[in-house]
Regions:
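Structured soluble/peripheral alpha/beta segments that form catalytic or ligand/cofactor-binding pockets
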Residues: 1-273
């Protein structure tokens, strides 16, 4: 969790994406669930939204818990993004193993669950940046392949804010199992077809521009078949020297049939581990 000055000026987010199949129509959709925390040391009994006109008028810095969940667009469907905000006073956290809960939204290393229900009236408030709809998820999580970012994400470089935003690709190949219910329609999520991804970002600000790409479903151009035990993850970052931003870099890992190939400035002399 965020500590020290980062607790007053920092964020942490846990991202998950995966596929689910509707058993009645066989429709396949790609879903996402994100848990995030912003400026926890400034929290009160109400979520403080930085984009809200009243809070801006009084000079209050944003501080809240947020759940963002929904479904990615498909041809003929614009997708759905739901956001719900919660006060820091509702947060419950345990360590070893890490566990986090606010309201009915639960995060742990091997399970995520929760629900969002946004009415049309609430969605009309532009400051909330949300669509209307409902989303329920209950999923087991198995993170099979992690991206190794080396020393650049250790405690020292985090403390001196060597990056604007740190990344840990803790599950660039993740298996999900469970169900999601999108606007009353149930989708089943199975490990073999979930093609899941999970990661964590933390820091003082989001990278701008934001660059992130990942895939757990790679197809060989040579054979036309799926590459087993393979995944690709790319993340952009902006390193600093003496608090001055340097040229933007990328962090990348390709896992090819079980073998990891890494490319980032944290491992300047090797491309593979």
């Amino acid at each position: 969790m965020l500590r020290g000055s980062d607790a007053k000026r920092g964020y942490m987010r846990w991202w998950h994406s995966f596929q689910g199949i509707c058993p009645t129509t066989q429709e396949t959709r790609t879903f996402f669930v994100e848990y995030s925390i912003l400026n926890p040391a400034l929290g009160t009994s109400q979520p403080i939204l930085g984009q809200h006109p009243d809070y801006k008028r009084h000079g209050l810095k944003p501080s809240y818990l947020c759940i963002k969940a929904g479904v990615f667009p498909e041809p003929g469907d614009s997708g759905l993004q739901l956001r719900a905000y919660y006060p820091l006073t509702s947060l419950q956290v345990a360590q070893d193993p890490f566990y986090m809960q606010f309201e009915d939204c639960v995060y742990s290393e091997n399970r995520i669950s929760g629900s969002i229900d946004i009415s049309d009236e609430v969605a009309r408030h532009r400051s909330l940046m949300t669509d209307a709809g409902s989303f329920i998820w209950d999923l087991e999580v198995h993170k099979a392949v992690a991206c190794h970012t080396g020393y650049i994400a250790n405690a020292f470089f985090t403390a001196v804010h060597a990056l604007e935003s740190f990344w840990h690709g803790e599950g660039i190949r993740t298996f999900f199992r469970g169900t999601v219910i999108l606007n009353g329609v149930t989708y089943e999520v199975t490990p073999e077809t979930s093609y899941g991804y999970a990661d964590k970002h933390w820091g003082r600000s989001y990278n701008q521009p934001w660059l992130q790409f990942a895939s757990g479903h790679l197809i060989s151009e040579k054979t036309g078949r799926e590459l087993k035990h393979s995944a690709l993850a790319i993340d952009g970052c902006c390193p600093k020297f003496l608090f001055f931003p340097m040229r933007r870099r990328i962090l990348m890992q390709l896992t090819y049939t079980g073998e990891d190939f890494e490319y980032h400035f944290g491992r300047p002399l090797t491309l593979s581990r």
